[in-house]
């Protein structure tokens, strides 16, 4: 599964193309409206407007074998600790070796 912190993610279209090419499900998580997809492999989740609601939703589900795309460094840290592969929208990879420095 690919989880996308979708509220301010500039690469949603690219993520969807790559996921479709590889047959991987995508869940877009946001506090506000998302454009519906006809693709059964794409899931939209609208969370409450509460602070960090989208981050909490993703962090509670992401784990080994999942990919998380986010520019939110604290969320990246939570997901790395849960065993997910995490990258920012620019392609920056967050991992155990660099997440401590990124959150500092």
Question: Predicted segment positions?
Answer:
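Nuclease catalytic cores that cleave nucleic-acid phosphodiester bonds
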Residues: 1-104
């Amino acid at each position: 599964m690919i989880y996308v912190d979708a509220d301010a993610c500039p690469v949603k279209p690219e993520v969807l193309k790559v996921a479709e090419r590889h047959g991987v499900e995508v869940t877009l998580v946001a506090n506000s409206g998302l454009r519906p997809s006809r693709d059964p492999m794409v899931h939209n989740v609208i969370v409450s407007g509460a602070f960090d609601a989208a981050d909490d939703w993703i962090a509670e589900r992401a784990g080994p074998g999942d990919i998380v795309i986010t520019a939110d460094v604290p969320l990246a840290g939570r997901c790395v600790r849960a065993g997910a592969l995490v990258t920012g929208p620019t392609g920056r990879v967050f991992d155990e070796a660099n997440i401590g420095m990124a959150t500092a």
